[in-house]
A protein has these predicted regions:
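Divalent metal-binding pocket/active-site signature
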Residues: 194-255, 383
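Active-site neighborhoods of metal-dependent hydrolases
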Residues: 190-213, 220, 266-406
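Metal-associated gating/positioning segment near the N- to mid-region
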Residues: 77-145, 164, 244, 248-255
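C-terminal motif of bacterial Sec signal peptides marking the signal peptidase cleavage site
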Residues: 18-19
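Active-site mouth loops of central-metabolism enzymes
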Residues: 100-113, 169-189, 238
Length: 477
């Protein structure tokens, strides 16, 4: 037993932790610089005591604790809240699509490996909370894997069987994956009541009448949308709208939704200059939450690049067998599907560049709101499509990079991933800052992310409900 205890202690010391032999439900983090939205500047080295997974004490003075308490010597490192990705889909496998549907259902072992690694990959990139606006049924499988981010979810209301997103499925069982359908016997009020009873924290609707310039899919009319909104507010549930086109934004704003679940990248307009600035000004004036989701268009373009999965960062977070499947062309079916919309002799690199125009438009829209001082929400929409390029955690980090490229400041990025989503979704009492009484989902970094987004690459330790996790231990095995 003595040898075992010595080995455990040696391992802990290796990444700044020390502990005695008796069990404790406390963790003491000493000599850290706290970086949190409620603090205008980072104070001198502080000490933080965590008890039962919650921050119990913060002090500039040494905190007296029993010898049994595990300790982390911060050595002047930076302690921040964990990130929240406000748009992540746990039930979709990159390169395959929805779990339980072809091709995912034909690769059970690969899907199982992905589901086991997915929460660890998110933690690897500092994501300790996620919101899934459309979790289907596999959210239960995600929640069963530990360790993993705290999962919050919306109840999604599809536009009937002929509308989006059900019309994108060709499987007979797909309708059963959408339990919150409005029918002749289930009113909007009944559906929202069930969403609330099932523990969701928001309601999602789809304002999508067709991709690109298409506009043939049915939408709910203003009367139904108003009833959904009123029912959601009666249950204190924010109303999210899937929308990415100017005309769909207009409907969303007229319906007085609370959050736009995508950035504005579709600028299709019948004639004349599209009223992009006017629409974005309405977003700002109405105080609507904004999820830029730059990675949707970026991931589509990158999926067309033949060597996309050779980038070294994928090996850290993608199970080896799944990565081999990607590299062997397993996900090329989706690249071929994307390429079918282009001239057959066009190089794939040129096709990818065309998707880059959409990225540029959504970055310009995000820049408009940043300049207006509008609070943003960090939201990657991983994977956003069957693209293999958008992998859990890495997708969030790349979204941060794209926000910075759009001109979003490190401070705004920091708030977009911490305090803003906590406020938007009624979680501020438990998440979003480093304060007494908050859930101890924290990150220990080598640099200050409020000054430079590169600091997000310096995560040393992830603390999940008071449990310290060495970052390297979260890599794909």
């Amino acid at each position: 037993m003595a040898v075992k205890v010595w080995l455990i202690t040696a391992i802990l010391v290796g990444f700044g932790l020390t502990a005695c032999t008796s069990e404790s439900n406390e963790l003491l983090i000493e000599n850290v610089v706290i970086v949190s939205a409620e603090r205008e500047t980072a104070p001198d080295a502080m000490n933080v005591l965590i008890r039962d997974g919650v921050i119990a004490e913060i002090s500039a003075e040494p905190i007296q604790a029993d010898r049994s308490v595990m300790r982390i010597e911060g050595d002047g490192r930076f302690l921040t809240p964990g990130l929240m990705d406000s748009h992540h889909h746990v039930a979709f496998v990159p390169g395959m699509g929805a779990i339980g549907v072809a091709p995912a259902r034909d690769h059970e072992a690969l899907v199982d490996a992905y589901m086991a690694q997915q929460p660890r990959s998110l933690l690897y990139y500092g994501v300790t909370q996620i919101l899934d606006p459309a979790p289907l049924l596999a959210w239960r499988d995600f929640a069963a894997n530990s360790p993993g981010p705290d999962l919050f979810r919306c109840g999604e209301i599809p536009n009937g069987e002929a509308g989006y997103p059900i019309n994108q499925r060709d499987d007979a069982d797909m309708v059963s994956l959408y339990p919150y359908r409005i029918t002749s016997t289930r009113t909007p009020e009944m559906v929202v009541e069930r969403i609330a009873a099932d523990g969701a924290i928001c309601v999602k609707i789809y304002l999508e009448d067709g991709f690109g310039a298409e506009s043939e899919w049915p939408l709910y009319d203003a009367e139904i949308l108003g009833r959904i909104r009123d029912a959601a507010r009666a249950h204190e549930l924010p109303l999210l709208a899937h929308a990415n086109a100017i005309d769909m934004y207009q409907i969303a704003l007229d319906a007085d939704v609370d959050v736009l679940a995508h950035g504005l990248w579709n600028w299709q307009w019948p004639e004349g200059d599209p009223p992009v600035a006017e629409i974005l000004q309405r977003v700002h004036e109405q105080g609507v939450g904004y999820m830029p989701t730059h990675r949707v268009m970026a991931g589509l373009g990158e999926h067309l690049l033949p060597a996309r999965m050779d980038a070294p960062e994928y090996a850290d977070i993608v199970p080896a067998d799944l990565l081999d499947w990607y590299r062997a062309g397993g996900a090329d079916w989706f690249a071929d599907e994307l390429a079918a919309d282009f001239p057959p002799d066009m190089p794939r690199e040129e096709m990818a560049a065309i998707f880059g125009y959409g990225v540029g438009r959504v970055q310009r829209a995000t820049a408009f709101l940043e300049q207006a001082g509008h609070p943003l929400l960090l939201a990657s929409d991983c994977p956003g499509s069957p693209t293999s390029a958008n992998q859990p955690g890495l997708c969030t980090r790349l979204e941060i990079e794209s926000l910075a490229q759009a001109g979003v400041s490190p401070e705004s990025v920091f708030r977009a991933g911490t305090i803003n989503p906590a406020r938007q979704f009624g979680l501020e009492a438990r998440y979003g800052t480093v304060e007494v009484g908050k859930v101890a989902n924290l990150l220990l970094l080598e640099a200050n992310p409020r000054l430079d987004i590169a600091a997000w690459d310096t995560i040393q330790t992830v603390i999940l409900h008071g449990e310290p996790l060495a970052r390297d231990d979260l890599k794909a095995r």
